[in-house]
Amino acid sequence: DPVVRQAAIDALGNMNGTVVAVEPTSGRILAMVNQKLALSSGAQPCSTIKLSVALAALSEGLISKETPVALGRRYRMNLTTALAHSNNAYFEALGRRLGFEKVAYYAHEYGLGELAGYNIAGEQLGAYPEQAIPEKLGGVGKMCSFGEGVSMTPLQLGAMVSAIANGGTLYYLQHPTKPEDVADFQPRVKRQLDIAPLIPELSDGMSGAVRFGTARSLRLNFNEEEILGKTGTCSHEGTRYGWFASYANTSIGRVVLVVFLQGGRPTFGPKAAEIAGRIYRNMYDHNFFIAGPGLPSDTATVNTVSTTP
């Protein structure tokens, strides 16, 4: 989509990063800026891994969004607050209660450790470890708070957030670039996730991140539509990473954005959220949210193909 692509290019500017925009009701990639980085083997997901961990804990019935989790002798926190403020201790506690096998099982269910795209040339895999990292490095707790030991790609994160945005369908992402390919586009379902009842438990925290939490910098540039998202900030071997994954919840449909930054300062999650706000602003100013092609309503019917890789 030329409107989305130009909006992303203008917002990213000279930052070393990539932007992936996805139509969550089909898995169609609307724009992919800096394809080399977008299709690379990925990076530590930082705090965006908390989305997967939260869904795992909700699926296992360990928590609801209001369940207080003890983080000390006198301090308790619920999921909504923990997501909004990206509280590491909360997700470390969840990870240890779940254990590595369940954490890994759900991460794979949501698409980590496997190709997110369908016949996208040059796409690399990312990596999810076969066992927990050593306790001296933080064990499963650090895997669940910072994504320590995990390598996630922007496409994998885009596919997972698209499944959250659409109610539980994990699509293969596809990137049609020719007009005839766009006209003949057919969504391909990877699998159905049993998360529809859990999404309301998750969405308050994702909305809170933008309204008052770690992603509130987005609202410096855009406040016309509801945005739900999750930031991530960390560093690995001297390289800083900044992530922000989100979706716009509009009256005519939804669109997913993943912003990934890599390098030195100011590379961190709130900066990625600020850039996402500029992208949404640019799209809004070009009437994308009024009648944008490629933004079908949630009730639209699309033909899909179930595909086995």
Q: What residues fall within each predicted segment?
A:
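Beta-lactam-recognizing serine transpeptidase/beta-lactamase-like catalytic domain environment
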Residues: 2-3, 7, 16-31, 41, ...
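Generic non-transmembrane alpha-helical segments
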Residues: 7, 11, 56, 205, ...
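Low-complexity, flexible helical/coil segments
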Residues: 55-59, 118-121, 128-131, 281-283, ...
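Short, gly/Ser/Thr-rich active-site loops of penicillin-recognizing serine hydrolases
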Residues: 273-309
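A short acidic/small-residue loop/turn micro-motif
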Residues: 35-39
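Active/ligand-binding-proximal structured segments within catalytic/core domains
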Residues: 46-55
